Swiss-Prot record:
It is found in: Membrane; Cytoplasm. It is an enzyme of class 2 (transferase). The gene is pub2. Residues 338-671 form the HECT domain. SUPFAM superfamilies: C2 domain (Calcium/lipid-binding domain, CaLB), Hect, E3 ligase catalytic domain, WW domain. This is E3 ubiquitin-protein ligase pub2. It comes from Schizosaccharomyces pombe (strain 972 / ATCC 24843). The active site is at residue 639. InterPro entries: C2_dom, C2_domain_sf, E3_ub_ligase_SMURF1, E3_ubiq-protein_ligase, HECT_dom, Hect_E3_ubiquitin_ligase, WW_dom, WW_dom_sf.
Amino acid sequence: MENIRFEVQLTILHVEGLWKNGLLRSLKPYLLISVDDDQFIKTNVASGTLRLSWGFTQKLTVSPQSIILLQLFDEKQKNETSDGFVGLGAAVVNSFLPFNNPKDDYKTRITLRSPSGSYRGSVVCLFKRSKFLPEELPADKSQICTDIIDDASGCAWETRIDEFGHVYYLKSPQLSVISAISHEKLENLTPKQLKEVFSQFLFNNQSKSSLKINLEYKVIKHLLEHYPLALSVRQQVAVEKGPLPAGWEMRLSEDYHVYFVDHSTKTTTWSDPRDNVVASDSVSENTDSIQQINDEYQRKIAYMYDRPEMAVNDAQLQLKVSRATTFEDAYDIISKLSVSDMKKKLLIRFRNEDGLDYGGVSREFFYILSHAIFNPGYSLFEYATDDNYGLQISPLSSVNPDFRSYFRFVGRVMGLAIYHRRYLDVQFVLPFYKRILQKPLCLEDVKDVDEVYYESLKWIKNNDVDESLCLNFSVEENRFGESVTVDLIPNGRNIAVNNQNKMNYLKALTEHKLVTSTEEQFNALKGGLNELIPDSVLQIFNENELDTLLNGKRDIDVQDWKRFTDYRSYTETDDIVIWFWELLSEWSPEKKAKLLQFATGTSRLPLSGFKDMHGSDGPRKFTIEKVGHISQLPKAHTCFNRLDIPPYNSKEELEQKLTIAIQETAGFGTE
């Protein structure tokens, strides 16, 4: 990545999920785009109503570390007092356009945030890379210090934020007034003082083109006026990597890009040397730490399943469901089972399929059922935010008159999965597990649910609160298009928030967001779970371990997979085996998970990975066997973690047949 800058063609396609108080709203939006506070572009107004589309295209020159900032404005909201600012978002180029990947076209979503949190959405962009533009960056062109000062020569030190979220300062004799003011001072400026600063800024930059200075003015204006918002955007692209190795220095180029100087070799590079140092120095330490975590978790698992209340009855519980109506069938059956029935050996049959359940069928049953239960379309659960796909209980689920029965059923399904050592395919927010373990929740837990909301609460905590904020002990909620005021305490809508009671206000808000808004639903779910798994068993785990117990491990390590794989009628040196592992290394995480689910019945793994995989008769490695004619598709034996692959003639043919198998086939048979 040394001395690399390249040209990209940015196409703004459309906006997704732009919400105002929970309702999709028709806007006349346009975007201001800036790259590293240098390139400023204004788009046309988007067309459409429910789907806001642009088709706007612009060429940009970027480096892997460049930060692209998008600001959204609404023409409809422009008036004498407002320029129609809606919100902003940012992304580091290398996070969605890796320079060393041969692919040239990348589609990405940049999340938009608004100061009030009332708007949510993302801008869908297409980046098309064209040519590289190598640049030499001499090491003596820029200087960095740790304070903002005016020296005797009249120069000032300009604040800059690098791609890691760190603040650095650039010495410049032509520094504008606005750049010489620290962020701490800006936070305390009144609107009138801000206006004076902006006016001075415009006066000092009269020589620039009117369009560019107007755009630059807007970018700076909204970053400064909405400091908590700008902070959250910077944190979105921040990556903390620790100190630089000995002999290295971080500097800024003339166009404000971060680069690194190795004084021992007198060379410069774009590459962060901490990436390699961290990786090499911490391998053995991390390995030991991970092994200790695995060992402790395995001891807890062994202890749990050795307890008398976790013993599986030798009698059989047979559940017969249809693939098309798995949720409905399972609800009708499981809701009526006694606790003693649920402790019998579980056998699943899919209607019109001959497959016998030696483990693989029940693994697939829980995989399919969890996708149905936790689908936000059923309104039992919802995504925490538009950019946080962790699930939480939906407060609006109580509109269903049978919601308690449904959540008791969900708790029973979770209990059955744990009791019979199966995995669900779901990702809850961390506070959900803490509630199950009866751990107290605090303000910091809000961050795991909604980081923007958390930053707003944190700002209230750390700053003076007065009447101008118009806060009281209530919240406004949207319930199916109707705005409803909910008191956080009795008569809360008539009690103003001030510096004396703001901590009580924050506590009440946290309690409402994480607990009381879904208390009845959670109690029903917890009751169903405790019918099979008592608290005395659950509470030996922490919240992260409980997530692993319920869902297994999500990350798939191809090298670990390869290390614990057996072969029948193939060897590691056969072309088909070599191609298989090459394909897995190239595939996306989603496609690898689909293959794992196809071959084993689940897309999840034990905490220690492939070495602890189980089949119908205990521990069983993943196996690749040479079976079938090249005209046939690969075949899976999920009960035995076995994949039958015919001896195809090329890597392309293997990929084509595997892709068809994992995407188009479903159902069990017998041999």
